[in-house]
Amino acid sequence: FEKEAEKIKAALGETLVAVHHIGSTAIVGIYAKPVIDMLVEVRDISEVDARSREVESLGYEVMGEFGIPGRRYLRKDNREGIRTHQVHIFAADSAQVRRHLAFRDFMNAHRVEA
């Protein structure tokens, strides 16, 4: 997560506010799928579109909103075509950001439910 987060930070530049580790690999003590999920908060979602080339140079496929209004979705596969990373980008402090982080934090705080 850490190495890839640094690459995303460099590609998105000044608009980036924060990168969070989410998804099953961010929940301690559960069996997780081997895909790193990241939640990225940005100041201006349109800046993400303007930086598509930088993101693609990291090996990501830029998928646009991909079914969720206000989101920018990126995915990355390894050389064998197996998904390794998913990046969900939203405007900083949006309802989607709060929802994703609340779920992750709930699951980490309530191990039985996880």
Regions found by a protein language model. Name each.
Residues F1-H20:
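Helical scaffold of the NTase/Pol beta-like nucleotidyltransferase catalytic core
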Residues I22-V28, R72-Y73:
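Short, solvent-exposed loop/turn elements at beta->coil junctions and helix N-caps
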Residues Y60-A95:
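Conserved catalytic core of two-metal-ion nucleotidyltransferases
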Residues G23, M38, V87-A91:
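A structural signal for short, well-ordered beta-strand segments
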Residues V28-E47:
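Catalytic metal-binding acidic patch
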Residues A50-G59:
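Short amphipathic alpha-helices in soluble, non-transmembrane regions
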Residues H20-H21, H85-H88, H100:
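Histidine-centered active-site/metal-ligand motif
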Residues A95-A114:
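Catalytic cores of NTP-dependent nucleotidyl/adenyl transfer enzymes across multiple folds
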